[in-house]
Amino acid sequence: MLNFISKPVGCLKGEITVPGDKSISHRSIIFGAIAIGTSVIDGFLDGEDCIATLKAFQSMGVRIEGPDKQRVIIHGVGKYGLKQPQNIIDCGNSGTSMRLLAGLLAAQQFDSQLTGDESLLKRPMLRISRPLSQMGADVTTQDGKPPIVIKGGKKLNGVHYVMPEASAQVKSCLLLAGMYAEGQTKITENAVSRDHTERMLRTFSYPVQIQDGTIVIDRNGECHGTRLNIPGDISSAAFFIVAASITPDSDVLIRNVGINPTRTGIIHILTEMGADIRILNQRAYGEEPVADLHIRYSQLKGIDIPVSMVPLAIDEFPVIFIAAACAQGKTTLHGAKELRLKESDRIGAMVDGLNQLGVHAEGFDDGILIEGGSIQGGEVNSRGDHRIAMSFAIAGAVASAPVTIKNCANVATSFPSFVTTANMLHFQIEEYS
């Protein structure tokens, strides 16, 4: 078992970059694989989750070179060129891989099966199997959870699906199926979710219409190979945005961070709490907006986090809770029940961990209350969740004594270089088994 010890530090200073965006990296492989022609992707995240997606397409006959220095070269086989995999596709810890692949595989002529690790096998999949079945797909789960068994050769028909809650994974799953369905597939969102798939469709020259919260796609298009630069992942940058905000005298610059407006909830929330975050040198990598982020220490105050921010910061809440633990006053969050269905029950994991470190925190069914103050040293269990592990590593920098975090191996799913990057800013994080 891999564990971290994070020791208190004086201040954090320096300039870093973070690895490529995980959501965009997954999608670059998917669309590159079914494109006509070759795609060159730079800035690819070579974490275990994205490698699971890459290996899935290699098992379906797609030639992919790399990753080599964050570059992958994908020799696309076209929309109808995938071949039946010889084995069950193992998605590891990656819910994104499983849910997006399910949409694509539901439209193929061959049978397939998707499985994953112990954590992934507990995650809900009816949210994709039900709408796929409405389209005519033959998709079965085990009591609503993986593994997923897909019978190929089914004729799919477009549907108009109104999303019951914000979920970029469900939306993307149905858009991928819609690329093969008879007639139009329409997806209406009542709350904003990540729009990387819609942007990626445009990058690969596939026709998609978006109007008044409804996305429309049909099968009358092809993806075409392209060149793509992937920006740094704001979900990875989040750890250092919070760290610089809560560690006195800190001054940190993070370059080349994706600032897609469906992902910048963390910046809005921390700014509302009083953080000093400056967005510099705004530009674009293809369809995705990018900037450099300059963060300096500022005393934070507790707030009631608006429900509208939940889908815009869903992956960043664990480290936002660390910021709340250091703020003056109470912070509350509601409307975030989805946090209980992630790689772990993130509300439960954070409440337990914060209480272990002397912070008063209470969990609700759909949120949390945190009374800010100071963080003590101690030991917490990440429950095998990469974002919980990294969040408590950040807490160690401002704790009164070292913080030990157990069960951190899954940090490699999203941020393999986390400890190295953190220590460049003068963190003191050590790994041990």
Swiss-Prot record:
Superkingdom as given in the UniProt entry: Bacteria
Keyword Glycoprotein: no
Species lineage: Bacteria, Pseudomonadati, Pseudomonadota, Gammaproteobacteria, Legionellales
Catalytic activity as recorded in UniProt: 3-phosphoshikimate + phosphoenolpyruvate = 5-O-(1-carboxyvinyl)-3-phosphoshikimate + phosphate
Enzyme Commission number, as recorded: 2.5.1.19
Protein name: 3-phosphoshikimate 1-carboxyvinyltransferase
Originating gene: aroA
Family label: Belongs to the EPSP synthase family.
A molecular function GO annotation: 3-phosphoshikimate 1-carboxyvinyltransferase activity
Main localization (coarse): cytoplasm
Species for this entry: Legionella pneumophila (strain Lens)
